[in-house]
Amino acid sequence: MSYVPIVIEQTSRGERAYDIYSRLLKERIIFVCSTVEDHMANLVVAQLLFLEAENPKKDIYMYINSPGGVVTAGLAIYDTMQYIKPKVATLCIGQACSMGSLLLCGGEKGMRYSLPHSRIMIHQPSGGYRGQATDIEIHAQETLKIKRLLNELYSKHTGQELKHIEKSMERDNFMSPEEAKKFGIIDNIISSRDAMTMSAK
């Protein structure tokens, strides 16, 4: 288990200790910095809902450094981002691959960012199934449905034609921030917090 730093906050009432992620949550910053799976997705969804309840008019900032993961877990986060009232700004730090790239481009239009040396990757969903032939066929059909759904979502958020999305996602498609901006996954490449603040205005 990795160590999570504890930070001390000085207030008029004394000192209070937070783990680093809880302290940043107070600043409306959410981290998606691991493989996307059900447990972490539930935590991210809960944080999004909490921040909406706290202030439905104030922006949320989602920092993404993820290799991707389970499609349904990623869609739970994506749907919640679209569902809540606050605008969700997304920022790629390191990598946003597979479902991580969908979350990146699913942020508020004009508020989707990447740091200069991040990597973004899109591809079609994969599945490995074992069992009876009928069950394998059922799962294969479901994978194709998910593939079509993801293609439609990428098309919606990037502005690319569906046929171009389908072709681009046929294999692992790695992009630099410049390429991701041209593709429509992000809106701006930033190297400082000031640049992020200025581009959001």
UniProtKB/Swiss-Prot annotation:
CDD domains: S14_ClpP_2 (cd07017). GO terms for cellular component: cytoplasm; endopeptidase Clp complex. It comes from the Bacteria. The active site is at 98 (nucleophile), 123. Signal peptide: none annotated. It holds the Pfam family CLP_protease. It catalyses: Hydrolysis of proteins to small peptides in the presence of ATP and magnesium. alpha-casein is the usual test substrate. In the absence of ATP, only oligopeptides shorter than five residues are hydrolyzed (such as succinyl-Leu-Tyr-|-NHMec, and Leu-Tyr-Leu-|-Tyr-Trp, in which cleavage of the -Tyr-|-Leu- and -Tyr-|-Trp bonds also occurs). GO terms for molecular function: ATP-dependent peptidase activity; ATPase binding; serine-type endopeptidase activity. GO terms for biological process: protein quality control for misfolded or incompletely synthesized proteins. This is ATP-dependent Clp protease proteolytic subunit. The gene is clpP.
